[in-house]
């Protein structure tokens, strides 16, 4: 079984996220999503609209996702790749090169982002339409 792992906050899940998850799953048989915890988001000075538990529930309902695990810090990736026996590490190409150190442990793939969509844009648009 080929295992794929990806990381993210996945707040206000949108079709760009779904596209990434679909393409990541297509690279293997089992997709693991490491989801940024609320505490880790605070360290990154990010505030999610949905809590970790809510975002986890949403991701678990996605047919492409097999397992959701918490992402608690920047340094857990090597341990996660080993623990979950990941064959492929996937991120959006906005992270190109940032995780090449994982090539000693698994294949690293940077997928092109879906054009014209981002969580930041979606949140800004939602604020505009609800004024």
Predicted regions and their residues:
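Nucleotidyltransferase catalytic core that binds NTPs
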Residues: 1-131
């Amino acid at each position: 079984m080929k295992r794929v792992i990806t990381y993210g906050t996945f707040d206000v899940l949108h079709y760009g996220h779904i596209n990434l998850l679909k393409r990541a799953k297509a690279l293997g048989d089992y997709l693991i999503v490491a989801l940024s915890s609320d505490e880790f988001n605070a360290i990154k000075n990010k505030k999610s609209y949905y809590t970790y538990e809510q975002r986890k529930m949403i991701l678990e309902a996605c047919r492409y996702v097999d397992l959701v695990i918490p992402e608690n810090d920047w340094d857990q990736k090597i341990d996660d790749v080993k623990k979950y026996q990941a064959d492929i590490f996937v991120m959006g190409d906005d992270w190109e090169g940032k995780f090449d150190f994982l090539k000693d442990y698994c294949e690293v793939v940077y997928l092109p982002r879906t054009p014209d969509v981002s969580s930041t844009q979606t949140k800004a648009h939602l604020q505009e339409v609800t004024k």
